[in-house]
A protein has these predicted regions:
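C-terminal alpha-helical interaction module
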Residues: 1-144
Length: 144
């Protein structure tokens, strides 16, 4: 989970929607939110070590995790990770990977995708198109 968060924050931490998603639930008055936004952003950077080397390493670990999910699904028939029923394994894996594909109706569905830089949009599209991304989206659409 830490690698998903580190890699993802490495891509999006400077976008205003991220801080809005973190701070808006607290309904801070405008001036207070202005003060807390940079403090929160810097705290997240430190907490998750959002630095190029660590983000790159986390990207590799995320890739390994996605490949493992895809291999597991291929061996088991493709719908669920363990057997032919929705289990805690599916809940855990789908919820940990959901931030990567931003399923509709989740807190991760926070961006107006047209406003994303082309490179980030391509990463999101690539993640959604691969089997693990399709699986996460299906679990959120069908089993939630």
């Amino acid at each position: 989970a830490v690698h998903v968060r580190r890699w993802l924050y490495g891509q999006i931490i400077d976008r205003p929607e991220v801080m809005d998603a973190m701070l808006d639930p607290y309904r801070l008055p405008g001036p207070l939110k202005k003060v807390w936004t940079p403090i929160t952003r810097e705290s997240v950077r430190r907490l998750y070590r959002i630095e190029p080397k660590a983000v790159a390493h986390s990207g590799q670990r995320v890739e390994e995790g996605l490949a493992l999910v895809e291999q597991t699904l291929q061996r088991g028939g493709g719908r669920y990770l363990v057997g032919d029923a929705f289990t805690l394994a599916d809940i855990a894996a789908a919820s940990l990977l959901a931030p990567l594909v931003s399923p509709a109706g989740t807190p991760w569905d926070m961006f107006e995708e047209g406003s994303l830089p082309a490179a980030l949009r391509k990463q999101l599209d690539d993640l959604r198109e691969r089997p693990a991304g399709q699986w996460v989206l299906a679990r959120y659409a069908e089993d939630r």
